[in-house]
Amino acid sequence: MQILTLISWDFKRNNNFFNQAVLNPYEYWADILEKNGISRYVILLTCNRVEIYLRAGFPEDLEAMKPNVLHDEEAIKHLMEVSSGLDSMSLGENEILKQVKEAYELSVRNGKVDKVLSLIFQKAIFVGKKVRSETEISRGKVSVPSIVYDILSSRVVQKVLIIGNGMIAGEIAPYLSGKFEVTIAGRNIDHVKDLASKYNYSYTTINDLHELIMRNDAIISATSSKTPIIRREEMVEGKLYIDLGNPRNIEDKPGADIITIDDIYSVSNRNGSARMESVDEARRIIEIEMASLMNKIKDVMIDEIFADFYKFAVVVQKMEIEKFSRMHPEIPASDVEAFAHSMINKVMNIPVMTLKSVARSQSNQDFSRIFSKFYDNFSDLVSAALQSYEGRQDTQSLRDRTRRLLQRS
């Protein structure tokens, strides 16, 4: 029996199809699932991944996009690694845990989760929090923008000048929003205006660079220039200079407070090494929580199938009560019903508890295989039992008869 299927595209694998998949909004994926009769799912969409978690079925429409496909334990383990930050571009990032939580909550609001799917995602969110609180996986910044932000925050800095409007400048700009007064400067006023307008920053050209340096506390140079942008004679004492260029954008000057891209990388590598040391510890936490979760899933699946069996027992109970009441009209029907109900509960309690105990001693694969066979044949077994019980030998569909009897109950 299928517990969970993951269909995914991400930045690590199948890049060609990922570039296509990541452009599609939530509604696109939900529409495909619904058209394929799939109603229990969670869709996780980020800049680096498209992941669709299903309880049952498989949308054949997506096969042409060559997705990664994982089933059951592998799919659940992957989700826990994602929520823990082990599968992120930046190891241990915090944002992904929030994104997993939001994806799950959206499916809850839309009525797209069942008990098993809820168990899986609630556990994954719990594991993500536990890994971060009990390991160093998220401690210490590793990205250039976050390290630059920490450096600025540790100094007496209010006004920041960013020189450049390329990729690095674009990555740093959002980190400073709301914290510093930022001006973006470059050679092309239209280009810097486009970047500055996203965050309501000031913008200008670098025609009078010395004056710009005078007006700001920290100067970040992030251009691809092959020659220095800031020369010694333009530098002002008491300013913080952060040079993210390669080659260098800022000339050396004795006594100047200059932090280079090599200094940034040194911090990143040091913090990254500390995070890597936490990976094994994080995986141990995932392994322990996986075992706990799988036992809960087994319990839920057993409860669900015995709930169907209980419905069958109620059908039989009603028939027997009717017969007994005709034979003994002097006994109140309510007393007979109470007695029968109590007997069913007591009789069923032992096999349910026993099966749960046995299930926990079986490997997850063995349990899934055995349970699938039992579940797939259950309706036929109940139908045959009903036919035998009623003593009827007609051509009516056993499955239809069972369904009607269960509805009557």
Curated annotation (Swiss-Prot):
It comes from the Archaea. Substrate binds at T46, C47, N48, R49, S88, E93, N94, E95, Q99. Keywords: NADP, Oxidoreductase, Porphyrin biosynthesis. Pfam families: GlutR_dimer, GlutR_N, Shikimate_DH. CDD domains: NAD_bind_Glutamyl_tRNA_reduct. The keyword Oxidoreductase applies. NADP(+) binds at G164, N165, G166, M167, I168, A169. One of its GO terms (biological process) is protoporphyrinogen IX biosynthetic process from glutamate. The active site is at C47. Its EC number is 1.2.1.70. InterPro entries: 4pyrrol_synth_GluRdtase, 4pyrrol_synth_GluRdtase_dimer, 4pyrrol_synth_GluRdtase_N, GluRdtase_CS, GluRdtase_dimer_dom_sf, GluRdtase_N_sf, NAD(P)-bd_dom_sf, Shikm_DH/Glu-tRNA_Rdtase. It catalyses: (S)-4-amino-5-oxopentanoate + tRNA(Glu) + NADP(+) = L-glutamyl-tRNA(Glu) + NADPH + H(+). The record marks H78 as: Important for activity. Belongs to the glutamyl-tRNA reductase family. During catalysis, the active site Cys acts as a nucleophile attacking the alpha-carbonyl group of tRNA-bound glutamate with the formation of a thioester intermediate between enzyme and glutamate, and the concomitant release of tRNA(Glu). The thioester intermediate is finally reduced by direct hydride transfer from NADPH, to form the product GSA. Homodimer. Catalyzes the NADPH-dependent reduction of glutamyl-tRNA(Glu) to glutamate 1-semialdehyde (GSA). This is Glutamyl-tRNA reductase. It comes from Thermoplasma acidophilum (strain ATCC 25905 / DSM 1728 / JCM 9062 / NBRC 15155 / AMRC-C165).
